[in-house]
A protein has these predicted regions:
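Short capping segments at the starts of secondary-structure elements
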Residues: 14, 26-30
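A short acidic, leucine-rich amphipathic alpha-helix
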Residues: 33-36
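Short, hydrophobic-biased segments on the C-terminal half of alpha helices
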Residues: 46-50
Length: 101
């Protein structure tokens, strides 16, 4: 059985975070569209999506020659990441934690 990737590994790349953010907000997108929206090269986007797919965070669907990607919401980790991203994006003011902003 493959080893589960650590949270640090999944979130260690700003490119992967951008991809997760786009997919959390939009849903399913074509690889080229993800690359364009995240301002990354096609090859870098493909590599990040492959890593996220191997971690079962993202799932790929092929429609002929078109490769579409979306979050794998069957995976509890992907659900948690999506919830975190949506909460983070919707938060307009920093919350006070132990007297610190």
């Amino acid at each position: 059985m493959p080893e589960k990737p650590s949270l640090a590994n999944v979130l260690s790349s700003s490119g992967r975070i951008k991809i997760l953010t786009i997919l959390s907000n939009v849903g399913e997108l074509h690889l080229s569209e993800i690359a364009r929206k995240t301002d990354q090269s096609y090859s870098a986007t493909d590599r990040h999506l492959q890593e996220l797919s191997e971690a079962s965070i993202v799932e790929e669907h092929d429609y002929g020659r078109v490769r579409m990607f979306r979050l794998n919401l069957e995976n509890p980790r992907a659900k948690i990441l999506r919830q975190l991203i949506l909460e983070w994006d919707n938060s307009t003011t920093p919350k006070m934690i132990d007297g610190q902003a």
